[in-house]
Amino acid sequence: MLTVIEDLLSKKEVTQFTQALDKGQWLDGKHTAGSQASKVKYNQQLDDGSALAIELRNTVIRKLSGNALFMSSALPNKIYPPKFNRYQGGEHYGLHVDASVMPIPNSHQMLRTDLSATLFLSEPKTYDGGELSIETQFGLQQIKLNAGSVILYPANSLHQVNPVTKGRRTASFFWIESLVRSNDQRSMLFDLDQSIQALTVELGSNDAEVKRLTGVYHNLMRSWATC
């Protein structure tokens, strides 16, 4: 399941992010890639230890935590601290699959990567290329969203960032360990939750069938959650 979360950041917030990132310290992205990924990774990455990176990643996490669509679709248990990258002058990230398990920085915890996420910080009209290409069961999906919007997709997907041939593509990226490991089960829970919300608006929260479906949702969560 691919989920688009529009306008996680407002236009004003995007401008604040990009102005701050223009002044940040950028490093060769290969330094943070695994042995296989480093062979196909050509981009720049914001210094993770900088005060700017810490400030911006905290803002992203705060916005995610307050977004109902993100919470419903991802069912997050842990969120890997968001990172920031940029591509320009033909830079790209070749076809790869993200690591299955990652250590969370500055902790003794590990994170299972159930979902990958990209928060676009550049408007599509400001750069050529740079599509996030994801191989799905329905074929190749080419993703290029408005600045401030997020794409969530299964972390076991083969994907790549196409070469940026003009302008600059800046983004934040991160991973989520979900309470529900299975993509299929998580997708069913999301559909059920969206239906419950729609029926609640139409019939009210005290409707017997709304209550029944809500009970089904929570019982499925109880059966499938891995926390």
From Swiss-Prot:
Matching PROSITE patterns: FE2OG_OXY
Keywords, alphabetical: Dioxygenase, Iron, Metal-binding, Oxidoreductase, Vitamin C
Binding site for Fe cation: 96, 98, 159
Residues bound to 2-oxoglutarate: 169
Cofactor binding comment, as recorded: Binds 1 Fe(2+) ion per subunit.
Swiss-Prot/TrEMBL cofactor(s): Fe(2+); L-ascorbate
Protein name: PKHD-type hydroxylase Patl_2273
Source organism of the structure: Pseudoalteromonas atlantica (strain T6c / ATCC BAA-1087)
Taxonomic path: Bacteria, Pseudomonadati, Pseudomonadota, Gammaproteobacteria, Alteromonadales
